C-alpha cells in the first residue's frame, strides 16, 4: 500500500508585497509532517505489518496531480503490488479531533476497516458536509483511483452549519492558497498527534488485512479497476 502527501504549494510570491513565498503550512506542510511522523513511528515499531507500506511524497499536485499521476503510472514496485492508497492533504487540525471525515469511505472495503478503526479510537465518522466540492477526486488519491486502486483521504471532522464549519469556511476565505497559510496561524498540535496516531493504526490495520482492498460493486470508481 502507498501513503502519500504532496510537497508542493504555490511557490514564489511575485506581487512584491508580503512574504517572498507561499508557505503552504496547511496545504500541505501538515500532510507531509503527518506522513513523515507516521513513517518514523512504523519504521521504529518492533512488530511490522504483514503488507509492505510505501511512504511517498509527491510534487506538482497544484499543477494537476502530476507527481502522483507519474508514480501511479510508473511505481517503484511492480504495479500489481500497489493495492491501496491513503492520502494526506489539508487535514486542517483546527479543533478537537473527536470526529473524522474520510473521503471515499463508502467506495471500497477499506472504508469498512476505517470505520472499525474510528470506532476503536472513539471517533465519530461524519459524512461529507459539502459533497458538491467533489473532494474525493481533487487530490493525489485520484491518480491512484484512475489506476484502479482503492483510496481514502482524511480531514478533521466537521458538520455543516456548526462552529467548526464556520472555522473551515473562514480558513478557506482567508488562508487557502494565500500567503496567510503560514506558521503564524493557530494549530491544535496535540490534536494533530491524535490524528496521526489514528492514521498509523488504520494503515497498520489495512496492511494486516488478509484480503486486499476492493472497490464495492456499488462504487462508480470500480470501472477503473476493470
Per-range role (PLM):
Residues 6-12, 89-93, 172-176:
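Short connector loops/turns at beta-strand edges and beta->alpha or beta->beta junctions
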Residues 1-56:
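Catalytic-core environment of secreted peptidases
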Residues 25-33, 47, 62-66, 104-108, ...:
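Soluble non-cytosolic domains of exported or imported proteins
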Residues 32, 36-39, 50, 65-72, ...:
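Extracytoplasmic/secreted envelope proteins and their assembly/folding machinery
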